[in-house]
């Protein structure tokens, strides 16, 4: 169990005790102080600021002890308001450290797309969205309740798994990116739908917001690029003879994401980390609620049905729901970041196709791909427009089809590749060819 933020930081009510405005911090200094965060070349009091953050305290808390430069830029689509944040300023990044700079090209693109987002919504969910969300959530709750009363059936259990996936794609995803509503409370409440369908909001935020979005396809930092030997996803992965067949067992293997939801989440929660990356101690106040919600899911979705109808059939139906939802989610996320020509990101001197020094705009666009059009976007929460989503995660998915032509033109004008597959099949075929190529034994330097 993680120590509470209060215990970790002592009884002091702020970081200013013993700290002057001229203090210089190394990145290690900040990493050891979860009450601090870095933006650009400055260090700020994250603990003091989080309660005033309009988007919710949990977002700021997750970046305690971290560099939030690109996170702020990506979620607010503007330059850091240094003068407004001066009262939270506690020092500067040491001269020995290289600050992360805002991507001016990205901010220029943000200014262009701002003109295409209706001012009445400011990029949050339009009124029509709430009808869709209500239908999906209501259908899932009604179907689950019906099967508790009438008993589990295999086909309805599969349908329920699909509805769980739609909740993940259409509701919790936008909510946990802060894209549904200007109200942090609304986003937080609907973000907890991740716990309702068997996941964990706090683990999702750590995996997706803190790690994946800022380090997409980074060979060391993106948790979605770690398959622990089961798959060879990137050129830096060690090769095994089993990888000859990875393009064949990839799709069946995606159903195994279910076991992550059922088992791995609990151990990661207890260890307060994701894929070895610690969750900020500043977010420690979310530990107990997150653990209780995980146990509540087990009680509601696993223990209660088995208590009411103890049988192998009931267990199979429970597994069918979780595996169906897991497969649907994993399938679309996987094909959007693993395809022919996709960039892999690594440090200078690595064998990756892109270095971490590339612009934010280029790193996000060339590690993602789009598929299909507005119809699939309506069904899948706009995540078939993965490029637009990675560039503008706090813009509601309903706007992505409208933004896509401008984004494509802007990126191509800057010499940045924009990959859009017309069909799911064409995207899948590219993914399988990509996995086949990575599954071949790499040549040694002597060959």
Curated annotation (Swiss-Prot):
<feature type="short sequence motif" description="Histidine box-3">
    <location>
        <begin position="386"/>
        <end position="390"/>
    </location>
</feature>
<comment type="similarity">
    <text>Belongs to the fatty acid desaturase type 1 family.</text>
</comment>
<keyword id="KW-0275">Fatty acid biosynthesis</keyword>
<keyword id="KW-0812">Transmembrane</keyword>
<keyword id="KW-0443">Lipid metabolism</keyword>
<feature type="transmembrane region" description="Helical">
    <location>
        <begin position="286"/>
        <end position="306"/>
    </location>
</feature>
<dbReference type="InterPro" id="IPR036400">
    <property type="entry name" value="Cyt_B5-like_heme/steroid_sf"/>
</dbReference>
<keyword id="KW-0249">Electron transport</keyword>
<keyword id="KW-0560">Oxidoreductase</keyword>
<feature type="short sequence motif" description="Histidine box-2">
    <location>
        <begin position="208"/>
        <end position="213"/>
    </location>
</feature>
<keyword id="KW-1133">Transmembrane helix</keyword>
<dbReference type="GO" id="GO:0006636">
    <property type="term" value="P:unsaturated fatty acid biosynthetic process"/>
</dbReference>
<dbReference type="Pfam" id="PF00487">
    <property type="entry name" value="FA_desaturase"/>
</dbReference>
<feature type="binding site" description="axial binding residue">
    <location>
        <position position="76"/>
    </location>
    <ligand>
        <name>heme</name>
    </ligand>
</feature>
<keyword id="KW-0479">Metal-binding</keyword>
<feature type="transmembrane region" description="Helical">
    <location>
        <begin position="244"/>
        <end position="264"/>
    </location>
</feature>
<keyword id="KW-0472">Membrane</keyword>
<keyword id="KW-0408">Iron</keyword>
<comment type="function">
    <text>Fatty acid desaturase that introduces a cis double bond at the 4-position in 22-carbon polyunsaturated fatty acids that contain a Delta(7) double bond, resulting in the production of delta-4 desaturated fatty acid docosahexanoic acid (DHA).</text>
</comment>
<feature type="domain" description="Cytochrome b5 heme-binding">
    <location>
        <begin position="36"/>
        <end position="94"/>
    </location>
</feature>
<dbReference type="InterPro" id="IPR005804">
    <property type="entry name" value="FA_desaturase_dom"/>
</dbReference>
<keyword id="KW-0813">Transport</keyword>
<keyword id="KW-0349">Heme</keyword>
<dbReference type="GO" id="GO:0046872">
    <property type="term" value="F:metal ion binding"/>
</dbReference>
<feature type="transmembrane region" description="Helical">
    <location>
        <begin position="315"/>
        <end position="335"/>
    </location>
</feature>
<feature type="transmembrane region" description="Helical">
    <location>
        <begin position="123"/>
        <end position="143"/>
    </location>
</feature>
<dbReference type="InterPro" id="IPR001199">
    <property type="entry name" value="Cyt_B5-like_heme/steroid-bd"/>
</dbReference>
<feature type="transmembrane region" description="Helical">
    <location>
        <begin position="154"/>
        <end position="174"/>
    </location>
</feature>
<dbReference type="Pfam" id="PF00173">
    <property type="entry name" value="Cyt-b5"/>
</dbReference>
<dbReference type="InterPro" id="IPR012171">
    <property type="entry name" value="Fatty_acid_desaturase"/>
</dbReference>
<keyword id="KW-0444">Lipid biosynthesis</keyword>
<dbReference type="GO" id="GO:0016717">
    <property type="term" value="F:oxidoreductase activity, acting on paired donors, with oxidation of a pair of donors resulting in the reduction of molecular oxygen to two molecules of water"/>
</dbReference>
<keyword id="KW-0276">Fatty acid metabolism</keyword>
<feature type="binding site" description="axial binding residue">
    <location>
        <position position="53"/>
    </location>
    <ligand>
        <name>heme</name>
    </ligand>
</feature>
<feature type="short sequence motif" description="Histidine box-1">
    <location>
        <begin position="173"/>
        <end position="177"/>
    </location>
</feature>
<feature type="transmembrane region" description="Helical">
    <location>
        <begin position="185"/>
        <end position="205"/>
    </location>
</feature>
<dbReference type="GO" id="GO:0042759">
    <property type="term" value="P:long-chain fatty acid biosynthetic process"/>
</dbReference>
<protein>
    <recommendedName>
        <fullName>Acyl-lipid (7-3)-desaturase</fullName>
        <ecNumber>1.14.19.31</ecNumber>
    </recommendedName>
</protein>
<dbReference type="GO" id="GO:0016020">
    <property type="term" value="C:membrane"/>
</dbReference>
């Amino acid at each position: 169990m993680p120590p509470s933020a209060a215990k970790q930081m002592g009884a002091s009510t702020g970081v200013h005790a013993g700290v002057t405005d001229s203090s210089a911090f190394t990145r290690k200094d900040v990493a050891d102080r979860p009450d601090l965060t870095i933006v650009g070349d400055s260090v700020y009091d994250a603990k003091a600021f989080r309660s005033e953050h309009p988007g919710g305290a949990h977002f700021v808390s997750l970046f305690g002890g971290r560099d939030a430069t690109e996170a702020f830029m990506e979620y607010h689509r503007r330059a850091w308001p240094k003068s407004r944040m001066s009262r939270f300023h506690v020092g500067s990044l040491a001269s020995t450290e290289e600050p992360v700079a805002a991507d001016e090209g990205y901010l220029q693109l943000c200014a262009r797309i701002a003109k295409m987002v209706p001012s009445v919504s400011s990029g949050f969910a339009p009124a029509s969205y709430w009808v869709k969300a209500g239908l999906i959530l209501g259908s899932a709750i009604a179907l689950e309740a019906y099967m508790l009363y009438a008993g589990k059936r295999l086909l309805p259990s599969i349908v329920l798994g699909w509805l769980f996936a739609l909740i993940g794609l259409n509701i919790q995803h936008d909510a946990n990116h802060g894209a549904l509503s200007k109200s942090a409370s609304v986003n937080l409440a609907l973000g907890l739908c991740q716990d309702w369908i068997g996941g964990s909001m706090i683990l999702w935020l750590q995996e997706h917001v803190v790690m994946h979005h800022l380090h997409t396809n980074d060979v060391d930092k993106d948790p979605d690029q770690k398959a622990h030997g089961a798959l060879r996803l990137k050129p830096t992965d060690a090769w095994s003879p089993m990888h000859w067949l990875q393009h064949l067992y990839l799709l069946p293997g995606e159903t195994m994401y279910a076991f992550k939801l059922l088992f791995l989440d609990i151990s990661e929660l207890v260890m307060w980390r994701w894929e070895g990356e610690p969750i900020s101690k500043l977010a420690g106040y979310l530990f107990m609620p997150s653990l209780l919600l995980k146990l509540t899911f087990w009680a509601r979705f696993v223990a209660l049905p088995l208590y009411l109808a103890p049988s192998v059939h009931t267990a199979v139906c429970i597994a069918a729901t979780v595996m169906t939802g897991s497969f649907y989610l994993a399938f679309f996320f996987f094909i959007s970041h693993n395809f022919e020509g996709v960039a892999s990101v690594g440090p200078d001197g690595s064998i990756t196709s892109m270095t971490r020094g590339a612009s934010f705009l280029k790193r996000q666009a060339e590690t993602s791909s789009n598929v299909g059009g507005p119809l699939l976007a309506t069904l899948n929460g706009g995540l078939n427009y993965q490029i637009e989503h990675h560039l503008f995660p706090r813009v509601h998915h309903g706007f992505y089809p409208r933004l896509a032509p401008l984004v494509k033109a802007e990126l191509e004008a800057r010499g940045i590749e924009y990959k859009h597959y017309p069909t799911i099949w064409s995207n899948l075929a590219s993914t399988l060819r990509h996995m086949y190529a990575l599954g071949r034994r790499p040549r040694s330097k002597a060959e």
